[in-house]
Structure formats: structure tokens, C-alpha cells
């Protein structure tokens, strides 16, 4: 328990915890800024009685990586007090993949198992939707420059995927991404129009997607910048899209950003109807904020957007 609290107290990427932390060994709790976090140990996801801890109708957030299909994730629902499950990864089979701001209204009361898609999908879909709604995308390619993850090896070792076996802190690793196919499930109007690939790089957090798009109509750099800036400030996706024109911004500056993505206005390239967008995202904290937004929707919690009359805006 003390080790878990220590990992929360000091984070190599996100820095020191802002507040107080206390460990209650007797009650198996970590108390963070007065909030009691109960640590529950069990032999399996179906072996917990949440009601013993005063928890009823719980939404279980599964970030174990152990299951991604409905059968595996439904094990949580066998535990007393658990009502619904959300996976922090792409769901397989018939599981609905929900991206806050895009298709959160597809959540129904009888949906017991949902997925929050991937961090990359959450980053690119809001920008693609905004651009497609305004300009109509003819085709495009997305290249993800992704921070390394603990799926990779620290030093060269065996891995089921050849290149990912090489040391993550030492190499740029070309790999694949399922984000392009995931996009078309969320935005069917882009089906067959996008390709995608990925490069894992030796940085611990904050990733970048380069969107190379052909639009149905020509635009200018100034016009596209203003459109994306306005979308970030006042649009339906203002919680998902951020926009920066800082000339010296780099990846580490965006650690802790709460948006699903940040459009780099200074890096936009436009030539007639061909555009290149550089879209940053904190693949840890920014994605976690998106997951929280989905959980809030599942729980029936909603916070207003500004302006107040924006009833149709995203969640």
C-alpha cells in the first residue's frame, strides 16, 4: 500500500502530487486530499463484494489490459455491487467504443459493458470530425508519433511483435495502429478514406498525430487556423480540441493537458485543398480525462459548457 501511495506521490512524468497523501494500513486505504481510496484485493474480477465497502451500482473502470471482449469484461458484473464496466482500450466484438464529444449519446441505459477506445482514437476523431463537417475530407493518411509504453521492452528482448522487442528508450520503432480503422466506426462517412501507421519514439509521454488530408474544397492557412481556433474556443468539441499558436512549444509542455488533443497552429501547412495538421495529445492524462467524461455520462452527471445556450454541444 505504501508503494502504491509512493507512486502517486512522485511521478516521473507528471511530477509531485499536489496535496496530501496518507496511508491507512489498518483499513487498507490511501487518503488523498481527504478522499478515501479503498484498495481491494481479490483472486478475480468476479470475487468481490463491493457492497461490503458501501459501494452499490458501481461503474468499474477496467485498465488491466487482461480482457477486451464482452465475455471477459462481464466477469466484473458477477461481483455484487457492480453494475457497469468501461474498458480503457478499444473494445472487441460488439462492444460500443465511446469517444466523449463524438458518440456519447449512443450510450443507453442497458449498456453494461462499454469501451473508451484508444488514446490515439480519442485524439484524432474530434479534429477529423470538425474538419470533415466543414470541408469534407476526400482522403488522407495519419502518422502517429507515439511515446513508448510499458508494452515495449526496456532493453532488447522477445516480443510477439518483432520491432517492439527492441529497447524502447533507444530506438524509433515503426509499428501499426488500429486508429484508422477505429475512426471509420465512429465516423462512418470517412470509411475507406483514411490510412494510418505509427512510430514509437523514446519519450515517456505526449504523442503527436500528423494528419495529411485532401479536402473537397480549397482553403487558406489563415482560414483553416481561424476555423480550428474557433472550434477549440466555442465549438461543440471545445472540451476535446485545444489550439495553440505558441512558436516554441514542444511535447513536454503539454503534459497534463486535459483536452483529447491540441492542434499546433504554427505547424499547419495548406496548399490549395491539401492540408497537413500536427495534433498533440497527452496520451496518459488527456486520455484519462476523456474516460472520466464517458463515466460521467454513464453516471448521468453533466456539467454545462460556456456559452450557456449551447445545448447541442458535446459532452
Give, region by region, the residue ranges found by the protein language model.
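Acidic active-site catalytic centers that drive phospho-/nucleotidyl reactions
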Residues: 62, 210, 282
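N-terminal Rossmann-like NAD(P) cofactor-binding subdomain of oxidoreductases
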Residues: 1-154, 158-165, 269, 293-294, ...
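A broad, structural surface signal
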Residues: 129, 133, 181, 222, ...
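NAD(P)-dependent Rossmann-like dehydrogenase/reductase catalytic/cofactor-binding core
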Residues: 255-315
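A generic structural signal for alpha-helix starts
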Residues: 122, 218-219, 286
Amino acid at each position: 500500500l505504501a508503494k502504491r501511495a509512493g507512486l502517486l506521490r512522485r511521478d516521473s512524468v507528471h511530477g509531485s502530487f499536489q496535496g496530501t497523501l496518507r496511508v491507512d494500513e489498518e483499513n487498507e486505504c490511501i487518503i488523498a486530499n481527504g478522499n478515501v481510496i479503498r484498495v481491494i484485493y481479490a483472486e478475480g474480477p468476479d470475487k468481490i463484494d463491493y457492497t461490503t465497502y458501501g459501494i452499490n451500482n458501481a461503474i468499474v473502470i477496467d485498465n488491466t489490459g487482461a480482457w477486451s471482449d464482452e465475455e471477459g469484461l462481464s466477469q466484473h458484473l458477477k461481483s455484487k455491487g457492480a453494475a457497469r464496466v468501461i474498458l480503457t482500450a478499444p473494445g472487441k466484438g460488439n462492444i460500443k467504443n465511446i469517444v466523449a464529444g463524438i458518440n456519447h449519446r449512443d450510450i443507453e441505459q442497458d449498456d453494461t459493458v462499454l469501451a473508451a477506445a484508444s488514446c490515439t482514437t480519442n485524439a484524432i476523431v474530434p479534429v477529423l470530425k470538425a474538419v470533415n463537417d466543414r470541408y469534407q475530407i476526400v482522403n488522407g493518411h495519419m502518422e502517429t508519433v507515439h511515446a513508448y509504453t510499458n508494452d515495449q521492452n526496456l532493453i532488447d528482448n522477445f516480443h510477439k511483435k518483432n520491432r517492439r522487442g527492441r529497447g524502447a528508450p533507444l530506438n524509433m520503432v515503426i509499428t501499426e495502429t488500429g486508429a484508422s480503422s477505429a475512426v471509420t466506426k465512429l465516423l462512418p462517412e470517412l470509411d475507406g478514406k483514411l490510412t494510418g501507421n505509427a512510430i514509437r519514439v523514446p519519450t515517456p509521454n505526449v504523442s503527436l498525430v500528423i494528419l495529411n488530408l485532401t479536402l473537397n474544397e480549397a482553403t487558406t492557412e489563415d482560414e483553416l487556423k481561424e476555423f480550428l481556433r474557433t472550434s477549440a474556443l466555442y465549438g461543440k468539441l471545445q472540451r476535446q480540441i485545444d489550439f495553440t499558436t505558441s512558436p516554441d512549444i514542444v511535447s513536454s509542455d503539454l503534459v497534463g493537458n486535459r483536452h483529447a488533443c491540441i492542434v499546433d497552429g504554427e505547424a499547419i501547412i495548406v496548399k490549395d485543398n491539401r492540408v497537413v495538421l500536427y495534433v498533440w495529445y497527452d496520451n496518459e492524462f488527456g486520455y484519462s480525462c476523456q474516460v472520466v467524461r464517458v463515466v460521467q455520462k454513464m453516471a448521468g452527471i453533466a456539467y454545462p459548457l460556456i456559452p450557456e445556450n449551447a445545448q447541442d454541444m458535446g459532452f
